[in-house]
């Protein structure tokens, strides 16, 4: 089982993944991505889904038109782990392919 990050480890990790923040009242991290249109947003989600499935680590997310809101936590560990940080970094990289920083 993957270990939860300590508060300090989480803060250090968040500095390396632009746009991500802690979720108030929950051991999770979140970010919103805004794309040009729905097609880009859905394309982003499709690419992330392939990465998430390969890693067997799936986001909580929702899409409204051109915005994708994401929450990451590792349910088995009861909070944020390295798996969440790695998936967040992958999401940032994929979003960058669409010109979203």
UniProtKB/Swiss-Prot annotation:
One GO-annotated biological process of the protein: tetrahydrobiopterin biosynthetic process
Q: Which reaction does it catalyse?
A: (4aS,6R)-4a-hydroxy-L-erythro-5,6,7,8-tetrahydrobiopterin = (6R)-L-erythro-6,7-dihydrobiopterin + H2O
InterPro entries, sorted: PCD_sf, Pterin_deHydtase
Q: What is this enzyme's class at the first EC digit?
A: lyase
Select a single GO molecular function from the record's annotations and give it: 4-alpha-hydroxytetrahydrobiopterin dehydratase activity
Q: Which Pfam families match?
A: Pterin_4a
| Family from the record | Belongs to the pterin-4-alpha-carbinolamine dehydratase family.
Q: What is this protein called?
A: Putative pterin-4-alpha-carbinolamine dehydratase
Enzyme Commission designation:
4.2.1.96
Q: Which organism is it from?
A: Rhodopseudomonas palustris (strain HaA2)
Q: Which UniProt keywords apply?
A: Lyase
């Amino acid at each position: 089982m993957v270990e939860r990050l300590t508060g300090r480890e989480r803060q250090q990790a968040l500095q390396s993944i632009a746009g991500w923040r802690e979720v108030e009242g929950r051991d999770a991290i979140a970010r919103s991505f805004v794309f040009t249109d729905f097609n880009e947003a859905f394309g982003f989600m499709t690419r992330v889904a392939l990465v998430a499935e390969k890693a067997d680590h799936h986001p909580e997310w929702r899409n409204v038109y051109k915005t994708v809101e994401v929450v990451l936590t590792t349910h088995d560990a009861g909070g944020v782990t390295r798996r969440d940080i790695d998936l967040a970094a992958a999401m940032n990289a994929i979003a960058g392919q669409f010109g979203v920083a």
